[in-house]
Amino acid sequence: MKIENKKILHTDILIIGGGTAGCYAALTIREKSDYSIIIAEKANIKRSGCLAAGVNAINAYIVKGRKPEDYVDYAKKDADGIVREDLLMTMSEGLNRVTDKMEKLGLVILKDENGEYVARGNRNIKINGENMKPILAEAVSKLTDCTVINRINITDYIVENNTIKGAYGFSIEDATAYEIRAKKVLCATGGAAGLYRPNNPGFSRHKMWYPPFNTGAGYAMGIRSGAEMTTFEMRFIALRCKDTIAPTGTIAQGVGAKQVNSLGEVYETKYGLTTSERVYGTVMENLEGRGPCYLRTEGISPQQDESLRKAYLNMAPSQTLKWVEAGKNPSEQNVEIEGTEPYIVGGHTASGYWVNTERETTIHGLYAAGDVAGGCPQKYVTGAMVEGEIAAIDMVSKLDADTSDGSPDTSAFDEKKALEAKASEYDHFLTERPQMFTTEAIEEAMQKVMDNYAGGISTHYQFNGKQLALAKEKINHLIELTGDLYASDMHELMFIYELKERLTVCLSVIAHLGARKETRWHSFAENLDYPGKSDDWMKYVNSRYENGQLHMIYRELGGREARYEHND
């Protein structure tokens, strides 16, 4: 098989990733301007990204009696201080605004008898959100001069003199290579799953917390292009219902269930209540012989039983089916819990692109929003929307201020030549040849390496310097092996590029884990060489890929009110 068609497209703004942040950015761009938009989506925007299956709560909302500063304080405490407060503040100020917009678009938000939103805790409100992504996608479909290209896999940025010019990619459905030229680009491709060996093997390996189709594409493209990245050492590990990997927050907040060990002892207060400490406590209780660990649901009311069964049937049906299969309601049997494999996801931790306050990366004209943007944890759905909005407003503002005549700065001949070169790269993998390893085999090897040597489930999320050195050596060897892979069709070609993306991200994760010489977040970054926490590491650990090497950059923490701009 070979690339048969080559298409060169031009637009004012290219949005890579039609998930939550990408769709909301498109809506904002059209509200503020008439600039042309192309959304490049690997799946189909109707059900793509983290929001594909919907959610039953808005987890980032300023409830009555609270203010944006409270949310910033919460996120800062959960991350033990390593956050960009300017990003958190600008995000928090927009949470309720984007929620109101979603309600106007048709999202059902539950209300009490007084017409007030039904709160779930200090930062959440309840919704009927199964159709949240289709609502967004439908709104995007009505925009004028907004072209959605579904089933296109973007593989590389076009960067000239540290300025974004567009991106390359290929169709997953036919043998077409794309070169999309744009004046501004928003990366909204989500985080990275599948780096580590998952909880469940074989056929069930994709029964995981984070979408398995989010493979770190945006991170990898940015890393290879020399964009500065931040805080990849702050991995995210979710505490989930065992085996089903269903959410635990619905039980913990919905019925007030505490974390208990096999002796019935409440252990959550022993280790701390931050996200990483809840995982760490569960790991330690098991290691010290007091496992399994549970959420204590025994003794809840029949009404609470019914509420939990319905809630999980809506968002994680396997958990409800597990109760049915066991013939026991939650009130009759505690729910066993476990930690997932680590993920890199800037919507929950601070890992991702290093951006200014307007969400522009260190590559001029390239913006990042949602899970791919760093420095701003605890975004959830609404935070991703706010970041898409902030980036969109700044892109429009910069385009409005552009005094050039708008003519392309690259000739049609050079554009065609560049696409020919990229198509040849794709053709290399589409050319049949003997291969010693399959894409899946190298992916499994990568996950085993990361699991064994870079703090995966099998090592209780712990690592040391010698293990990280081995991990780097082995991942580099696997990268060499990818050069001989063969794809029989465009879908298999996508798998090869997803693997290459993950391997690129793995090297950054390994470098960052080794660079932060402390253990600030138990389990998230459990460094056995440096088991304590040090004030010397109250700083950002950043990196930039230059001349074939990752160079570490250390930056001082920034303030809440100051607006950050890239100066070096």
Label for each model-derived stretch:
Residues 13-39:
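N-terminal Rossmann-like FAD-binding beta1-loop-alpha1 element of flavoenzymes
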Residues 187-246, 381-394:
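Glycine-rich loop(s) and the adjacent beta-strand/alpha-helix scaffold that form part
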Residues 129-156, 160-179, 219, 225:
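Helical element adjacent to the flavin cofactor pocket in flavoenzyme catalytic cores
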Residues 59-91:
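Glycine-rich active-site loop/strand segments that organize a redox cofactor
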Residues 400-488:
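Long, amphipathic alpha-helical stalk/connector segments used for oligomerization, subunit docking
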Residues 8-11, 174-184, 362:
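Core beta-strand elements of the Rossmann-like FAD/NAD(P) dinucleotide-binding domain
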Residues 104-155, 231-380, 385, 452-568:
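Mobile, glycine/GP-rich and aromatic-enriched active-site lid/loop segments adjacent to catalytic centers
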Residues 31-53:
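Glycine-rich FAD pyrophosphate-binding loop
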